[in-house]
Amino acid sequence: MTLGERIRQARKSRGITQRALAGGDLSESFISMLEHDRVRPSLETLRVLAGRLGLPLAELLDAEPPPSRQVRVKIDLGNALLRQHRFTEAMEAFQEAERRLAPGSPLEAVFRVTIGLGQALTGLSHFDLAEQHLAKGEALAEALGRPDLIARVASAAGLLSLRKRDLPAARDAFTRALAAIRSADPVDAEFEGRILINLGRTYSDLGLPAQALHCLESARARLEPLHDLGALGLLHFNLGVAYERQRAFEVARAHLEKAAVLFEAQENLGLLATAKRSLGILLVNRGQPREGADLLEQSMRVAVSLADDLGRAQTLTELARASLLVGDLDAARRQAEEAIRLAVKLQNPTEAARAETIMAAICHREGRLDEAANRYAYALEQFERLHAAGEVARVSREYGFLLLERGEEGRAARLFARAFRAQDEAVAAR
């Protein structure tokens, strides 16, 4: 760990702002440059900072030398682009950093480039290549014996599993990441908060809103003192999703609107589109499909401009649902078909199953019961495999009512029983 990284981690773990660390004798801009290894402090300055951070001076003196300036700049750029979900540009930044790594470069610099490449590949849905980079990163972290780096590998693995919609694997990876970062000394409070956000998001997707809220409120306690707009935007977004699933709609809407404001302030268009999509979903769920569709269309325009196929697929599924609710079956069919096409292209079984469920409802409305039954059966199989108890309960109920119309009371009864079991599983897990 370089001197700048060590000072930054110690400061954040103690909840100290750059201004407070600067005190009356140093400037806030000096602390910022120091944390990015852009200035070399005097021994006396190091002694002052060590005292304010409660660290032995020797711990600052034995820090690793920083990587070359060009490599550091590219790593910082890549990480900033990852936070904005600009994965192609992030990939290019990390590839340039990799080309600039000199023989004998610090292992931590090699680690950060390797993990950055893995995360960019994850965002681009190149999962096999991403896994290879994460495996290399894990080996480097273990060679360095650094629990904070082991936590970053586990967190990246969790994001990969989330992207693949393997929710149990994501939960396990984020749990490992949390244990690892808490064993580091000092603990990076910002990164711990981000792991808690992602663990909360995973619980929310698993249909476990109570556990999600516990993680997210714990994240709030870590992040609010740090005033990091990006992290706070993600926190409020995921709180909004979790409260929406608890049917606390007004609380959810307030969090989602706050997230949208924070993302817009950062000009983070990808996450702004995600927040608007979630606000649209909330309005549709509250019986306002036309108003919700307006927000969904705004989200769609941004997703198209960013070439975000996953965002397009997710938004199209929700637009199809809104169209179905207002009785525009032609539009609903077009939107659901395109969502399915994109989800299959992305190899995203969860999104494909969600769109298939909407298509099944369209077929049901049109009286094409056999096709509707086949689509419900496919969606149910996918959600069972993904351990998505809430979705299993919902699809089982819808499928059961369809079978009642077809006169298949026995099969319908089994599906209703499956819906009750899935609901009980979700409640028990909370």
Language-model region placement:
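Short basic helix-loop element that most often maps to the first helix and adjoining turn
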Residues: 1, 5-22, 80-84
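Amphipathic alpha-helical segments of tetratricopeptide repeats
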Residues: 95-102, 135-145, 175-186, 217-228, ...
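C-terminal non-catalytic interaction modules
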Residues: 1, 8, 12, 36, ...
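DNA major-groove recognition helix of helix-turn-helix/homeodomain DNA-binding modules
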Residues: 42-59
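TPR/Sel1-like alpha-solenoid repeat signature
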Residues: 74, 81, 93, 110-121, ...
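Short alpha-helical DNA-recognition segment
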Residues: 12-34, 95
